[in-house]
Amino acid sequence: MSFTLAHFSDVHLGPVGLSDVFNDFRLKRIVGGLSWRFRRRGLHINSHADGLRADILAQVPDHICFTGDLVNIASKAEFRRGLEWLKSFGEPPAVTMVPGNHDAYVKAAHETGLGLFNAFMQGDGSASDHAFPFVRLRRNVAIIGLNSAVPQSLRKAGGTLGPQQRVALEMRLKDLGA
């Protein structure tokens, strides 16, 4: 039985407008907004992301996984735009998301930030807001979502899996017979 999984990441949807930077003020957002404006704007082009989406949907995959960096500076406006874009791939049972470091660029309110994506970031039968790692079973495939995205200081961008997630992952893998 075949299973087609479409996987992609790092679309960094733009543009990053001044209102994204100043209406949701953090010093790191100013630095990131300027970086986007003067360096990254030519790298992260929405028409490329839209072309990727069209190509993925034309392949009619069994499931779609997006693994981070939907946005640039984690502003409320970016998250709202990103949610609409991600929804255009399909309903949450058919689309899985885990955040990347730019999705956790700064500490942000869950309900107006990553919380908007809860339905895409939870396991089968789970309604928890913070359910990493989560497991989604799709036919003969287990999709396991981990979250290494943590807000970092001004000049840093990275991530880590804490001991709690690693222990939970080990338990989930045992439950799956792996």
Segments predicted by a language model, with ranges:
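N-terminal active-site segment of His-dependent metallophosphoesterases
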Residues: M1-F79
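Proteins with a high burden of low-complexity, intrinsically disordered sequence enriched in S/T/G/P/A and R
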Residues: S35, G177-A178
